[in-house]
Amino acid sequence: MTGKVLAVLIGSLLLGVGVNGFLVPHHLLDGGMIGIGLIMHYFYGWPTGLTMIFLSIPLYVLAWILERKYFFHSLHGLLVSSLFIDLFAPIEQGLQLGIFSSAIIGGLLVGCGIGLMLRYETSTGGTDLLAQLIHKFFSLNVGLLIFMIDGLVVLSGLKVIGLEKFMYSLLTITCVGLMTALCVIKRETIL
């Protein structure tokens, strides 16, 4: 239990820093619910974390009905990570790296945060939760589903962020995916 709590706290800290310190200053996107929250933030000025919570409500209702295990394993991750993303919003002014470095570092931090939570069988919910629910009924690969959803989210933000930032956002979601995969690999698999 302590490991899961620490994973949620540290993972959420990494998400908050990755999103606000590296993605937001350049108007870059991540995939999933974070990406949708960022699109709403860039377009309407809405708080990213709070937007993530509101947009996740239908998925959590569905999870409650179809598979309560997914509901309970991800609700705390969604709430804490959304809080940290909004608490760390002021740091977007502090770090001023180039867009290429920010896309990579932001993606690595976000991926590490998500991967750490997944390693301890929790998550931020959102589209990860959607992918798990789709997998339950259609036996499609969860990783592939998440990657496809992330790509669609970034593609949907193309008009808001423009082509150049879209390309850098593709680099970001690639880094997120790679780092997430590395974090969830069991230690004995690496050795």
Predicted regions and their residues:
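Core subunits and conserved enzymes of cellular information-processing
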Residues: 1-191
